[in-house]
């Protein structure tokens, strides 16, 4: 089951959309109503149809980029617990609670006439590495394809879809513990270090606890894409990426090793060239802008026409 959760600002008016397959419509609505009983859900036309397609030299300007995690996948960003939104924090006064969406919504609501900002968050269940019985015909096929290597059991689509994310988390914890282990028990091949956790500094202990809590939950492959689309006379270059990335900083704690952060993937930024001679007549920028616009409209991220990218 794949979903596209979309937050859209059309001239400062904020809308929330969920893009899914028809067969999952009732499931999505049921889950929404169970959490938000007073919510109003309406099936609507695709809002991207109400603006002209991006064309170089046209009346509209486009900037777009995708986001990535700044650190290893195993390190989580801030979650509802950190914002005092879990059951243990229900006793907090309203003024003590933090709504993590506020900076983003405030920024998006500041858009003027002729400006639109679209953000789509792709979600699908996180898969694991391929684990099949050695007698399986599929394994035999992969052996024929890749040879007698262990790699054929760890295929990855570079979007994280077939990685064992829980094993990655445990491996990361083991790495931290090993770095702070001091006592060796046993000899030879049976020797191992112990005492790692108690030797960890406070921020590293907090990090281990957060990673452990993260891998105990359901995992999801997530991708974030942002498009800023505006008429040329209304275009504000400061909106994207600066204002968007600034509005996402509340999910990180820059001075703490316990948190990951969301950052712009510079390889996907449509206007990422620094000097005029790198892009004669803006041909490369126009091509990138048109591609990102089309990928957004098609909701393509995990599969073609999107291409797999590292990070």
Where do the PLM segments sit?
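Extended, folded cores of ATP/NTP-driven motor/assembly subunits in large transport
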Residues: 1-311
């Amino acid at each position: 089951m794949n979903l596209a959760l979309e937050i859209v600002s059309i001239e400062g008016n904020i809308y929330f959309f969920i893009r899914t397959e028809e067969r999952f419509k009732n499931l999505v609505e049921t889950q929404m109503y169970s959490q938000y009983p007073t919510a109003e859900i309406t099936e609507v036309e695709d809002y991207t149809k109400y603006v002209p397609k991006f064309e170089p030299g046209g009346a509209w300007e486009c900037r777009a980029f995708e986001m990535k995690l700044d650190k290893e996948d195993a390190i989580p960003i801030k979650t509802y617990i950190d914002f005092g939104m879990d059951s243990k924090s229900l006793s907090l006064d309203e003024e003590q609670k933090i709504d993590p969406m506020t900076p983003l919504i405030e920024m998006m609501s500041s858009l003027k006439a002729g400006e639109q900002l679209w953000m789509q968050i792709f979600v699908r269940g996180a898969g694991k590495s391929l684990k099949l019985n050695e007698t399986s015909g599929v394994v035999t096929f992969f052996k024929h394809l890749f040879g007698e290597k262990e790699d054929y059991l760890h295929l990855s689509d570079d979007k994280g879809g077939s990685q064992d994310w829980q094993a990655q988390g445990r491996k990361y914890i083991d790495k931290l513990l090993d770095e702070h282990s001091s006592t060796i028990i046993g000899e030879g091949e049976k020797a191992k270090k112990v005492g790692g956790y108690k030797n960890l500094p406070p921020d590293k202990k907090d990090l281990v606890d957060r990673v452990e809590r993260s891998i105990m939950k359901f995992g999801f492959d997530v991708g974030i894409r942002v498009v800023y689309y505006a008429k040329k006379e209304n275009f504000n270059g400061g909106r994207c990426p600066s204002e968007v990335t600034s509005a996402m900083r509340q999910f990180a704690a820059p001075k703490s090793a316990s948190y990951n952060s969301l950052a712009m993937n510079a390889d996907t930024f449509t206007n990422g060239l620094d000097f005029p001679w790198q892009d004669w007549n803006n041909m490369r920028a126009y091509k990138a802008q048109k591609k990102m616009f089309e990928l957004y409209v098609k909701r393509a991220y995990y599969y073609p026409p999107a291409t797999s990218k590292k990070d």
